[in-house]
């Protein structure tokens, strides 16, 4: 697993996410890439009763004790990343 250092700076983190998973990336590839970078990901489909958004999305989170937490959401259309949801650091 490539964990590396992620920036606590929100702009730098968002740029890194967009570099790792560009628009048009297949859902399975997006999940594989993010998990490779130490994130835990959950794919939520429109058939999930807790999904009120109307689209499939992938939520990825990475937590580190006494440091920062990172999270990113990828929104899918036709099985590919069509836009980015929230991307944040805590």
Positions of PLM-derived features:
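C-terminal motif of bacterial Sec signal peptides marking the signal peptidase cleavage site
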Residues: 2-4
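Bacterial signal peptide processing site
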Residues: 6-8
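Electropositive phosphate-/nucleotide-binding environments in soluble metabolic enzymes
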Residues: 11
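Post-signal peptide N-terminal segment of mature Sec-exported envelope proteins
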Residues: 14-35
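A cross-family detector of function-defining hotspots
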Residues: 31-75, 89
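A short, surface-exposed interaction/processing loop segment used at functional sites
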Residues: 77-90
């Amino acid at each position: 697993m490539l964990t590396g250092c992620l920036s606590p700076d929100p702009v730098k983190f968002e740029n890194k996410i967009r570099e790792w998973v560009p628009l048009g990336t297949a859902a399975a590839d997006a999940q594989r890439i993010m998990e490779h970078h130490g994130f835990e990901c959950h794919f939520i489909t429109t058939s999930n009763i807790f999904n009120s958004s109307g689209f499939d999305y992938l939520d990825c989170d990475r937590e580190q004790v006494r440091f920062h937490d990172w999270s990113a959401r990828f929104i899918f259309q036709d099985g590919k990343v069509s836009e980015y949801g929230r991307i944040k650091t805590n």
